[in-house]
Amino acid sequence: MAFILGSGSPRRLDLLAQLGITPDAVRPPEIDETPAKGELPRAYCTRISREKVAAVEAGPDDIVLCADTTVALGRRILGKPADADEAARFLRSLSGRRHRVITAVAVRRGGRLWERDVVSQVKVKRLSEGEISAYLTTGDWQGKAGAYAIQGPAGAFVPWISGSFSAIVGLPLAETAVLLAAAGHSKFKGDT
């Protein structure tokens, strides 16, 4: 049995390390992450994590873990910005408001699937144009849903969260441990 992480995210690798787990392989899946017309953020996030875990090649006894993190402002999905201009628009829209960060986790072993999603609330302080410009020059917005990472420089913009910090970063640790135990990961033998 091999444990495969279906993600290229260094943050997810770090979070798994907090559980004492190192993947035997890292295989980021290639899927189309375009939201369907009218698709709601939570349904979108769950669909993407399922599609990711289905797209990873694995043996019948291997355990595959995939996740998707989505930033939602109301019904609007804020994905990974294409460029600095879009990142600035995202940050302006989040400024002074609460939004949701949804992380869906899917674990597959053979034909079985275990999944869970975690919804956290995040408040972003009012941002000045100077703060937005300075943040954009760091490049930290690149490849990040909603144009920010709470564990990076943008953490200074977040005075309040409700929910799971690790889920906001990209992998809810408590829920992930439960899913891996259900799938029979050796790290959790005897824990169920």
From Swiss-Prot:
**GO MF entry, a single one:** dTTP diphosphatase activity
Under the heading Gene3D superfamilies, the entry gives: 3.90.950.10
Q: Which UniProt keywords apply?
A: Cytoplasm, Hydrolase, Nucleotide metabolism, Plasmid
Cofactor or coenzyme needed? a divalent metal cation
Q: Name one GO cellular component term.
A: cytoplasm
Q: Where is this site: Important for substrate specificity?
A: R11, T69, Q151
> Which GO biological process categories is it annotated with?
nucleotide metabolic process
What the entry lists under HAMAP family is as follows: Maf
By sequence similarity, the record places it as follows: Belongs to the Maf family. YhdE subfamily.
Briefly state the protein's biological role.
Nucleoside triphosphate pyrophosphatase that hydrolyzes dTTP and UTP. May have a dual role in cell division arrest and in preventing the incorporation of modified nucleotides into cellular nucleic acids.
**Designated name of the protein:** dTTP/UTP pyrophosphatase
Q: Which organism is it from?
A: Ruegeria pomeroyi (strain ATCC 700808 / DSM 15171 / DSS-3) (Silicibacter pomeroyi)
Question: What phylogenetic lineage does the species belong to?
Answer: Bacteria, Pseudomonadati, Pseudomonadota, Alphaproteobacteria, Rhodobacterales
